[in-house]
Amino acid sequence: MLERAQRTLKRKVHYSGVGIHFGKSATLTLEPAEENTGIVFYRSDLLGDRIPALLPHVCNTGRSTTLSSGDSVIATVEHLMAALRSSNIDNVIVRCGEEEIPIGDGSSHVFMQLIDEAGICTQNDTVPIAKLARPVYYQTQDTFLAAFPCDELKISYTLHYPQSPTIGTQYRSFVITEESFRKEIAPCRTFALYNELCFLMDRGLIRGGCLENAVVFKDDGIISLGQLRFPDEPVRHKILDLIGDLSLVGRPFVAHIVAVGSGHSSNIALGRKILEELQP
């Protein structure tokens, strides 16, 4: 059975910023936690319930991933969760003073900086690294995801945006390690199509969106502060989102994930199927 030592943070760290969808400023605090705590969210502005970062607590997947417990809700957790998962951090208390995690620059970069500032502490207890008993898949319309037994965590993603010549069809495949995530995936920002913006605003979303935290694709060009960080930054960001969503399985696992056009809803659906087939 594969296993490794559990890990937490060495010290408490803070970050203040705005949420991309609700546009509210909030302070985020990451705190060390005891062994076998898991990743747990608290709303520091409420005397509410603890919100474990687990699939049963997912309550909304519209343009981001939202968790809830009782009356407590915390939105847009995926970029933070991707950073924690890829850094092999098992136990941490996350406190947020609003209903949405601050977006930073739209990537996982700020959360990797927080983890570096806090430092990582190895704990005494171990955690098993689970494997898939058999392949699983999820499909709906033009979206397809599958997970195959593998001895490492690998993600292969195909993104197809025929409505955007600048994005077009992109494909990337990475073995996910702390190093590969930090260098190849964490800097990649969230993005939207220009013709989606009115629709999103009409739904009360992206109130905190701006060119400091997102890339907008318009016709055959981009609207951004500076150039793309990678020529295929959109597909890399989709891999970032997928890592964050699948971290809600709540257990370290290895598999080869193949995804075509997936989003938060389908990522979570695959996560539930993976959880059913993990061993031990």
From Swiss-Prot:
Which EC class, in a word? hydrolase
Q: Which reaction is the catalytic activity of this chain?
A: a UDP-3-O-[(3R)-3-hydroxyacyl]-N-acetyl-alpha-D-glucosamine + H2O = a UDP-3-O-[(3R)-3-hydroxyacyl]-alpha-D-glucosamine + acetate
Q: In which pathway does it act?
A: Glycolipid biosynthesis; lipid IV(A) biosynthesis; lipid IV(A) from (3R)-3-hydroxytetradecanoyl-[acyl-carrier-protein] and UDP-N-acetyl-alpha-D-glucosamine: step 2/6
Positions bound to Zn(2+): H79, H237, D241
Cofactor(s) essential for the protein = Zn(2+)
GO cellular component terms listed in the entry, alphabetical order: membrane
One GO BP: lipid A biosynthetic process
Reported EC number(s) for this entry are: 3.5.1.108
User: Which NCBIfam families is this protein grouped with?
Assistant: lpxC
The name on file for this protein is: UDP-3-O-acyl-N-acetylglucosamine deacetylase
Organism the protein comes from: Chlamydia felis (strain Fe/C-56)
Q: What is the lineage of its organism?
A: Bacteria, Pseudomonadati, Chlamydiota, Chlamydiia, Chlamydiales
Recorded name of the encoding gene: lpxC
